[in-house]
């Protein structure tokens, strides 16, 4: 009986550790190539539990906000409202935290996804 309780407690503790969100709070920078040129980005993230918030600054579209942000372990997702050819669009991001780098996949509209890496900025 005690062995079963101990095993259950261990499994519960391991589950809590695995679900812990990576702390990516702070400034991150990166760039990706588009058909019209290089787009430089600055992301300022805040993490509260599993909720991801913050701001973005694009050399192409200007400032925006992080919306619908979630982070679970090393996996994250969020959306960014933007404009394309004068029309409002929603850019969707998914990503994987890799220490001081995050691999992001960015999609919007009928365009193929952009994959790029951002780096923590000190």
Which ranges hold each PLM region?
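Repetitive helical segments and hydrophobic/amphipathic motifs
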Residues: 12-13
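Sec/Tat signal peptide C-region and signal peptidase I cleavage site
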Residues: 16-21
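Central antiparallel beta-sheet cores of small beta-barrel/beta-sandwich binding domains
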Residues: 22-122
């Amino acid at each position: 009986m005690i062995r079963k309780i101990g095993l259950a407690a261990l499994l519960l503790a391991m589950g809590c550790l695995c679900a812990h969100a990576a702390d990516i709070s702070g400034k991150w920078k990166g760039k990706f190539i588009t058909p019209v040129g290089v787009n430089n980005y600055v992301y300022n993230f805040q993490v509260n539990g599993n909720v991801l918030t913050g701001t973005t600054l694009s050399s192409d579209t200007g400032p925006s906000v992080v919306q619908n942000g979630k982070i679970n372990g090393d996996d994250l997702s969020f959306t960014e409202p933007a404009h394309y050819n004068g029309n409002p669009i929603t850019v969707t991001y998914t990503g994987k935290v890799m220490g001081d780098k995050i691999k992001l996949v960015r999609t919007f509209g009928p365009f193929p996804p952009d994959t790029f890496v951002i780096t923590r900025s000190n």
